[in-house]
Amino acid sequence: MAGELADKKDRDASPSKEERKRSRTPDRERDRDRDRKSSPSKDRKRHRSRDRRRGGSRSRSRSRSKSAERERRHKERERDKERDRNKKDRDRDKDGHRRDKDRKRSSLSPGRGKDFKSRKDRDSKKDEEDEHGDKKPKAQPLSLEELLAKKKAEEEAEAKPKFLSKAEREAEALKRRQQEVEERQRMLEEERKKRKQFQDLGRKMLEDPQERERRERRERMERETNGNEDEEGRQKIREEKDKSKELHAIKERYLGGIKKRRRTRHLNDRKFVFEWDASEDTSIDYNPLYKERHQVQLLGRGFIAGIDLKQQKREQSRFYGDLMEKRRTLEEKEQEEARFRKLRKKEAKQRWDDRHWSQKKLDEMTDRDWRIFREDYSITTKGGKIPNPIRSWKDSSLPPHILEVIDKCGYKEPTPIQRQAIPIGLQNRDIIGVAETGSGKTAAFLIPLLVWITTLPKIDRIEESDQGPYAIILAPTRELAQQIEEETIKFGKPLGIRTVAVIGGISREDQGFRLRMGCEIVIATPGRLIDVLENRYLVPSRCTYVVLDEADRMIDMGFEPDVQKILEHMPVSNQKPDTDEAEDPEKMLANFESGKHKYRQTVMFTATMPPAVERLARSYLRRPAVVYIGSAGKPHERVEQKVFLMSESEKRKKLLAILEQGFDPPIIIFVNQKKGCDVLAKSLEKMGYNACTLHGGKGQEQREFALSNLKAGAKDILVATDVAGRGIDIQDVSMVVNYDMAKNIEDYIHRIGRTGRAGKSGVAITFLTKEDSAVFYELKQAILESPVSSCPPELANHPDAQHKPGTILTKKRREETIFA
């Protein structure tokens, strides 16, 4: 049955081949017509050539026209063959596709396979005959229509769904499965390698150091062994190259070679030629005998050929030394010994003089030591004939009873301002002390005053008690005056020196009664002192010691006319001359022990030096000695400054968050207005904090009560205005909060100076708003100069913090815009 089907199929296939042959001729004609249409220029050329032949000369050779016609026909025949060959290729592709299908069917029926094979043989024979019958034509490029048709056919073939048999689908599934298995195995292998690497690393970290050292040594030896093998191969190649170079050099030297002609320099050449001949290079030696010199390995103190160069040098020097010793006379030997002794003595003296000043006695101090001493304590002086500072209380020239009082008051070591101001004050010279707050200025002017008062006869002091005090100390605020009074009583009471405070808020009659009873020192505020002077409660006829404490603060508060009025009440009979005599200690100490005839001494202490203070100093001070301690007008280096930019409504919440951090009491909070001070204190008390207030609206008793409670520890927080910003010494203040920023940088510096006193550290926190932009620039500079503070970027990058207020900014020329 299968054979009959195959025969029938052959019969059906044979007529189709005959029809295919017949259909070739119309196809050729159709292609020829298309070529004629696509190339009308060729037809025109043919018509022209015919016309030329008709109208031309008959004498033209007929053989030439026949050959041209023959060439044309040959070209057309070649073109037809090329088209037939292309069509044959297309038919062959179709037959191949059909054969693949038949092969699949033949796998199911063996009979079909045999018929198909015979048919295939017949087709291949026919194709071979066709190929042998026609010559291979010249390849022609495909036309544009054929390219487009081919591309369209490919797109359609790709768009059609491809049918896959069951076997092909199974093969595809098997292939995908195999790829998935390989990918999984690869990932497992990578994970295994990473785990092994991690375990090896952990094992190396946990293993014994000795075991790790042995393992590293073993690995290093293995690497060296492998490296030595490679090195030996490289060494052999190197030796062969060196041998060839050495042989070449010997041949050139002794057998003669082509010598390179050296370039000669002509006279007209501008450039000098620095060239050396290659044979003149003696730095490289290719002979291994000289290249690798043998180093002899010796044990102990062995030497090559028994020669010890060091020993030879020693013996040689000893020989010449003995020879010179024999030639020297006795006098020369003595001179040499004296020279050595002098040299040793000079070196010992140099070492002795180079000791630190703390290891020397007072009489051993040199000018260099005093300069180092001043640098150690940041002391800078200005003025003529300034005495040296005191190193300690024992080294000072103070009387024993004064030293005893100082020791009882707990002053172990003098502060920098005390070290320099006390010796100047003992010479009866005018002083301007510029020092930071909390530097011990009170004792600096009190101790010279107490020394002078105690030198006066006690009888004179009692008899002349109705003529007024010996000293007047002016302070800008009541609190500072009371603080100075406490210190003065502490020093003066053991010495029998009476002190009276003349300040506002206390009955004037009580103060007048105490003044009539007699006193040596009066501590006053400018306003109340003028009132007392005008009402004749006080007569400054024997006042020869005037102190202006916190002079810059007094000027800022508008007390400059009052201070000038007070100084005009002083007697002029004991005023110093404004000459060089004011700098001469001998003339200044004349009549030092008399109460009336001693020159008046004026002392001014300030934290800053504004122009108004300088003007006051020029008017009433005579040739003063100026003492600068540290960086005047700048905050403590031990105070950490923190700044927060916020709105007014956020201040209270931020303050409570800061207080919850647990800062140790006492804490001072500064506010600009009296009303705000009371409101903030009440709100803090409602939150459970112990707070008290201090401002100018409070009575004197209330102010004293608030300060005493804070110092005693009954209250933890003091809410104050700028009244508490200057001069008030409250020990161990851990934090200062500027709830409202000060109006100028000087007040800000004095505010934060309440903490970080007496060598301790502190924290100063400031709340800033947009209204405080006038002080942004100076505040930024103050924070940047502090070594323990950091400026926040909100303040550092703020436009108002880039330039000082009032400066006119001009654009650079390259930033200017020119409008034409």
UniProtKB/Swiss-Prot annotation:
Q: Which GO terms describe its cellular component?
A: chromatin; nucleus; spliceosomal complex
Residues of the Helicase C-terminal domain: 651-799
EC annotation?
3.6.4.13
Report the top EC class in one word: hydrolase
Mod. after translation: In vitro phosphorylated by CLK1 and U1 snRNP-associated protein kinase. Phosphorylated by SRPK2 and this phosphorylation is required for its association with the tri-snRNP (U4/U6-U5 tri-small nuclear ribonucleoproteins) and subsequent spliceosomal B complex formation. May be phosphorylated by SRPK2 on Ser residues in the SR domain; the phosphorylation is required for the removal of inappropriate R-loops during transcription.
Q: InterPro entries given for it? A: DEAD/DEAH_box_helicase_dom, Helicase_ATP-bd, Helicase_C-like, P-loop_NTPase, RNA-helicase_DEAD-box_CS, RNA_helicase_DEAD_Q_motif
Q: Which SMART domains match?
A: DEXDc, HELICc
Entry binding sites for ATP:
435-442
* Compositional bias (Basic residues): 43-65
Q: Where is the composition biased (Basic and acidic residues)?
A: 1-42, 66-105, 112-137, 147-226, 233-244
* Residue span of motif DEAD box: 549-552
Q: Disordered: where is this region?
A: 1-244
Task: Give the modified residues of type Phosphoserine.
Answer: 14, 16, 107, 109
Domain Helicase ATP-binding, residue spans: 422-627
GO MF entry, a single one = nucleic acid binding
Q: List the disulfide bonds.
A: none
| Physiological role | Involved in pre-mRNA splicing and its phosphorylated form (by SRPK2) is required for spliceosomal B complex formation. Independently of its spliceosome formation function, required for the suppression of incorrect R-loops formed during transcription; R-loops are composed of a DNA:RNA hybrid and the associated non-template single-stranded DNA.
Protein name as it appears in the record = Probable ATP-dependent RNA helicase DDX23
Annotated organism of origin: Pongo abelii (Sumatran orangutan)
The coding gene here is DDX23
